[in-house]
Amino acid sequence: VLYQAVNVFSMDVIDVNSAAPKTCD
């Protein structure tokens, strides 16, 4: 659960920094 939360957070940060469309739901 913790890893999943961190993964989502990291993905969100990467999405903002890269300004790329989210491919993960």
From Swiss-Prot:
GO terms for molecular function: carbohydrate binding. N-glycosylated. The keyword Protein transport does not apply. Keywords: Glycoprotein, Hemagglutinin, Lectin. Hemagglutinating activity is stable when incubated over the range of 20-70 degrees Celsius for 60 minutes but is almost lost after incubation for 60 minutes at 80 degrees Celsius. The keyword Glycoprotein applies. Hemagglutinating activity is stable over the pH range 4.0-12.0 but decreases below pH 3. Homodimer. D-galactose specific lectin. Binds in decreasing order of affinity: melibiose, N-acetyllactosamine, D-galacturonic acid, D-galactose, methyl-alpha-D-galactoside, D-galactose, methyl-alpha-D-galactopyranoside, methyl-beta-D-galactopyranoside and lactose. Binds also the glycoproteins globotriose, asialofetuin and mucin. Possesses glycan-dependent cytotoxic activity against Burkitt's lymphoma Raji cells and erythroleukemia K562 cells. Has calcium-independent hemagglutinating activity towards human erythrocytes. This is Galactose-binding lectin-2. It comes from Aplysia kurodai. The lineage of its organism: Eukaryota, Metazoa, Spiralia, Lophotrochozoa, Mollusca.
